[in-house]
Amino acid sequence: MFLTRSEYDRGVNTFSPEGRLFQVEYAIEAIKLGSTAIGIQTSEGVCLAVEKRITSPLMEPSSIEKIVEIDAHIGCAMSGLIADAKTLIDKARVETQNHWFTYNETMTVESVTQAVSNLALQFGEEDADPGAMSRPFGVALLFGGVDEKGPQLFHMDPSGTFVQCDARAIGSASEGAQSSLQEVYHKSMTLKEAIKSSLIILKQVMEEKLNATNIELATVQPGQNFHMFTKEELEEVIKDI
């Protein structure tokens, strides 16, 4: 006798007869409630752009972080439950520092994503990593950086699946943004074009009017460290779109 759907819903480690893990599927749905984030990989570097939802005029916009630095050569954009993202971000930062201390070299973007996805998969285990949770993480991440292979962009979802992308959108308006990215992206795209395209797409999908306080923008270029755009720099870029 099969259990009812609601009983499969409650078990994070139980497959349904159709071979589905409902809790993981629900975690992926949680991403669709998050703010929109876009990552674009070019030969000149990677750009990450994220919408910041300012729900009250009394909120301090600078306190909302949607793009963070993992290491000098890697940045990460997030969408979904930000509290869940903090645990994964901490894991990524510890891994990059341990790698540096152990091997005296910077960690590749793929290796960082792999380390974080391993933690994302450990939900519900009794002897899991101390950072693991009793449920799947309700957050999707875009890791953008530069390593010996050049500029790299990786997308990771709550199932622990990660994949390299040329351009990727996550969050509430990801479907519309992804189809727009497919139209504008080309292999010879410059970083400047990528920045402009990502902001134009954000402008199209955001409910609020795009300005320097309700978006975040960061780039990572070969030979240069992770750079988060200041409010003044954002205003300059927004003028052009």
UniProtKB/Swiss-Prot annotation:
InterPro entries, alphabetized: Ntn_hydrolases_N, Proteasome_alpha, Proteasome_alpha-type, Proteasome_alpha_type_5, Proteasome_asu_N, Proteasome_sua/b
Pfam family membership, one: Proteasome_A_N
Tissue expression as described in the entry: Expressed in fetal brain (at protein level).
Source species, domain of life: Eukaryota
Self-association and partners: The 26S proteasome consists of a 20S proteasome core and two 19S regulatory subunits. The 20S proteasome core is a barrel-shaped complex made of 28 subunits that are arranged in four stacked rings. The two outer rings are each formed by seven alpha subunits, and the two inner rings are formed by seven beta subunits. The proteolytic activity is exerted by three beta-subunits PSMB5, PSMB6 and PSMB7. PSMA5 interacts directly with the PSMG1-PSMG2 heterodimer which promotes 20S proteasome assembly.
UniProtKB keywords: Acetylation, Cytoplasm, Glycoprotein, Nucleus, Phosphoprotein, Proteasome
Keyword Glycoprotein found: yes
Taxonomic classification: Eukaryota, Metazoa, Chordata, Craniata, Vertebrata
Name of the protein: Proteasome subunit alpha type-5
Similarity field: Belongs to the peptidase T1A family.
Function: Component of the 20S core proteasome complex involved in the proteolytic degradation of most intracellular proteins. This complex plays numerous essential roles within the cell by associating with different regulatory particles. Associated with two 19S regulatory particles, forms the 26S proteasome and thus participates in the ATP-dependent degradation of ubiquitinated proteins.
One of the protein's GO biological processes: proteasome-mediated ubiquitin-dependent protein catabolic process
Phosphoserine PTM sites in chain numbering: S16, S56, S63
Signal peptide feature range: none
Species: Homo sapiens
Residues carrying sugar: S198
